[in-house]
Amino acid sequence: MAIAHLVENYMVQHGVTYDVVTHAHSRSSMETAQLAHIPGDRLAKSVVLEDDEGFVMAVLPSTCHIRLGRLSKELNRKLRLATENKLPTLFGDCELGAIPPVGLAYGMTTVIDDSLANQPEIYFEAGDHEKLIRMKREEFMALMDHAGHARFAARM
């Protein structure tokens, strides 16, 4: 599978520079970091949340878990994990479990954990289980220019 179409188009529209990194098939973000030989703190993962107002994508390092209560309070919403059966409809150009953390490309409210701003480069799923996008922190932040920022991640 190629890069997810909506993500690729979004990156082109934003004029960001990136590389594609290929790795063996993986089943989790931590396994992806190991197989791609990259620090897990530099691999951004997405967690799709929902409430009565709609969907929110939380973006955080693969070495962390989301503090849902903290993010809900920050956004003044009653967020919960989105049910997995809704994801194929929302992300039709991606494989399940390999959703790129670029919710903005899908018209989704997106919030980035502040800890990602400390990394010199960011990697993220391209839409399948065998490719990553790699870009400098500045490029990633330019790509995510309309995303919110908060502290909601806790190391595992």
Question: What is each of the regions a protein language model found here?
Answer:
Residues 1-156:
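Extended, low-hydrophobicity, polar/charged segments
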